[in-house]
Structures are given as structure tokens and as C-alpha cells.
Amino acid sequence: MIGIKSIASYVPVAGVDNYAQGAKFEKNEEFILGKIGSAFLPRKDADQETSDLCVEAVNALFANNPQLKRESIDVLIVVTQNGDEEGLPHTAAIVQDKLGLPTTVAAFDISLGCSGYVYGIYAIKGFMEATGLKNGLLVTADPYSKIVDPEDRNTTMLFGDAATATWMGENPAWELGKAKFGTDGSGAPHLKVTDGVFFMNGRQVFNFALLKVPAHLHELLEDSDLQTSDIDAFCIHQGSAAIVDAVARRFEGEPEKFIKDMVETGNTISSSVPLLLEKHMLNSSWKRVAISGFGVGLSWGSAILQRP
């Protein structure tokens, strides 16, 4: 059975002081921490491309797992909507070359935003099991610094750059359980890029998260024959502190189980869930975790991860 064996990440050291940004827009520390949730927003270097972030994360994964060899990688999937240059060729091909992976590797991108990790782990699991592959890499990297207007108070205080790499293979540390997905393209205008600049209708996105995610998680638990008490933690997309707090309250069941950890990262799009899993789940005593990603599309996905 294919599942999650290990997760590693790359978070740029350089970045933006969000308190300073907030002061520019007359927002105080209480607002920055309480509503936004991030005091610091990592930023890639100007000469770093999306593929470079991917390479850093994968190299960290190799360093943490010396038994995993480059020549053993069968498939590489990159989840991004802000790939290298103008998006052609696909970023996964560039990452394959920069990493020196074998040319026998299957490599492709998945164009999804904040729901991308949940979709991605099931997509790569299905691809690997259908084709009999042994070792896969699911990489997330969506540097919004490429598209966010630093003068837009609705977006510039939210997003951080980061990348993650997940080793998918047999004899996993975490198995993939039930999952549920959804899409509502009528909400596409609420999160979009026009002429290279990102736009977000924050109120609509907040309402979407509040209405959709708690109910979706309850449906997932019901489909899995699980109770809230069976879940050790809920690792949901870190859209903002306000969103995580509101979803936890609306869920109405052990809100303290909802992990909120974005003070030093910001909203890292498809990397936010795996960053939580790497930091809080991998070396924990947890037995079962619920994850959920939601955003651009509008798109959402929720799933159960469990120890074998």
C-alpha cells in the first residue's frame, strides 16, 4: 500500500516583517497576530525560481532519508500555479533536470492552489498503484511573491513562500484513509490573477471556508465511521488565523484539536498542510489525523491519515 513515508520542507530565511507592513496600512500588532496570524512572511530571492524552491525541499528530503536514492524515484509531481517563468514547460520537468533524477521518471504538474496537497497525495498514490511504481515525490511550491501586489492591503500581509517534498511509497509511516473533494467554479472570480497580479475577495473566501469546511469535515468523519474523539488533530489549510479560528469554532467539537501554526510562515498555499504535518505529525504519538485544504477554484479536499 502506497502512503506517506516522510516529509521535508524549504522555507526561505529572508522575508518581510509583517508588523512593519501592518504599520504601513495602519494595522496594529493585535490585528496582525489575531486576524492574519503571521509576524514574518518568508520570501524567495529575486533570482530564485519556483523550481529552485522545489529542489531545496527535495534535497532536504534526501538528506533526512539517506536510504532514498535519486535513481530510485519513479514519479515526480509538482503542485503549483506559479511555475517557472511563464509556466511552459511544466515545472516538474525542470525540477527533474536540476535534481539529476533519471529520465525514466514520470514528471508532471498539478494546477491547484490551497487544496493541492490533499488532491496531490491521492493523485500520486493512484498513479503509482495503477502503474506499479515504488517511490514517488509530491512537491508543493507556489511562491505568491511573484503575483502579490505589495501595495494591496488585502493580500500582501497574508502570503509566504515555501516548498515541501513528500516521499510516497510502500510500508508508509502514514496511510491514506477516506477522502472527500469538491469544486465550485462559480467562485472562481474570488481568487484570480489578471495581468500577472493576484486578486482576492477576502470576505467571500472567509465565508466560503466557514460554510464549507466544517461541514465537509463532519461528512468525512461520518463516511469514515469516526467521531471527533477518534481524531488526534485537525491539520487544515492555514489561510489566516481568523479562518482557522472560525472553522474550529464552527466545527463545534474539540476546537483545541485544530492546529494553528503560521506565525513564521504565513499562508503558503499548497505547502501549508504538509508544513503542519512535517512539524506536528511525523514525530508525534498521534494515530489519526484529519487534513483539509481549500481555496482557489473554488476547490476543497479533506482526508483522514492514519498509522498502519
What is the meaning of each model-derived region?
Residues I4-S6, I32, L61, L76, ...:
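Buried hydrophobic positions in well-ordered alpha/beta secondary-structure cores of metabolic enzymes
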Residues S38, V75-V78, D97-S111, I147-D149, ...:
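Glycine/charged-rich beta-loop-alpha catalytic/anionic-binding loops adjacent to active sites
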Residues E129-G160:
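Flexible, glycine-rich active-site loops centered on histidine and acidic residues
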Residues N28, T50-N65, A209-S224, L276-L277:
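Short, well-ordered amphipathic alpha-helical segments that serve as non-catalytic structural scaffolds
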Residues M1-A46, P150-L211, A215, E219, ...:
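Condensing-enzyme catalytic core mediating Claisen C-C bond formation in acyl metabolism
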